[in-house]
C-alpha cells in the first residue's frame, strides 16, 4: 500500500533523509521512532506534501500511484495529512462543524454523498461511544 524506496531528502542544502526504505501493507500500523534530528518529522512532512524540502532520490508510492506527484490537497484525500497536537482555536468554528466539513470533503473525493448534520451527529455519537470519549467533545471549539 505504501512503499518508500531509498528516499533521500533535505532542506536548505542539508541532507536529512539518507536512503529511507519502508513498506506498509493495508491494515498494518507502524510507529516511526528515533532520536531528535533523525528525520521523523521530515519524513512526515514530506509525505504530507509540505513545501521547502528537496528530494534528491528515491520514490514513494501509495496504492500504486506516485505520492510525490500529488498536491498536498490530493494527498489529504488519500489520507496523508498532519494534525497539530495543540491546534489553534478558530473562533466560531466548533469541532463538530470542522470534522463534518473534513469528512464531507473526503466523501466528495470518493464520489459519496455528503452527510447531513443529523447523520453526521449520529455517526459522531457512535464513534464517541466506541472510543469511550466524553460527549462534551461535540460542543468543543
Which residues make up each language-model segment?
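Conserved hydrophobic segment flanking the Walker A/P-loop of ABC-type ATPase nucleotide-binding domains
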Residues: 24-26
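ABC nucleotide-binding domain signature
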Residues: 31, 76-85, 125
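The feature captures the beta-strand-to-loop junction immediately N-terminal to the Walker
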Residues: 33-35
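Helix-to-loop junction immediately C-terminal to a conserved catalytic motif
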Residues: 48
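ABC ATPase NBD Q-loop/coupling interface
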Residues: 59-75
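ABC-family P-loop ATPase nucleotide-binding domains
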Residues: 88-141
Amino acid at each position: 500500500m505504501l512503499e518508500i524506496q531509498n528516499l533521500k531528502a533535505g532542506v536548505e542544502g542539508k541532507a536529512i533523509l539518507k536512503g529511507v526504505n519502508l513498506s506498509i501493507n493495508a491494515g498494518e500500523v507502524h510507529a516511526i521512532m528515533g532520536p531528535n534530528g533523525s528525520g521523523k518529522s521530515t519524513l512526515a512532512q514530506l509525505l504530507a506534501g509540505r513545501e521547502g524540502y528537496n528530494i534528491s532520490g528515491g520514490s514513494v508510492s501509495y496504492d500504486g500511484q506516485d505520492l510525490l506527484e500529488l498536491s498536498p490537497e490530493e494527498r489529504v484525500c488519500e489520507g496523508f495529512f498532519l494534525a497539530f497536537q495543540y491546534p489553534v482555536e478558530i473562533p466560531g468554528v466548533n469541532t463538530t462543524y470542522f470534522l463534518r466539513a473534513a469528512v464531507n470533503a473526503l466523501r466528495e473525493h470518493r464520489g459519496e454523498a455528503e452527510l447531513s448534520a443529523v447523520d453526521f451527529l449520529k455517526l459522531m455519537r457512535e464513534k464517541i461511544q466506541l472510543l469511550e470519549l466524553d460527549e462534551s467533545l461535540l460542543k468543543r471549539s
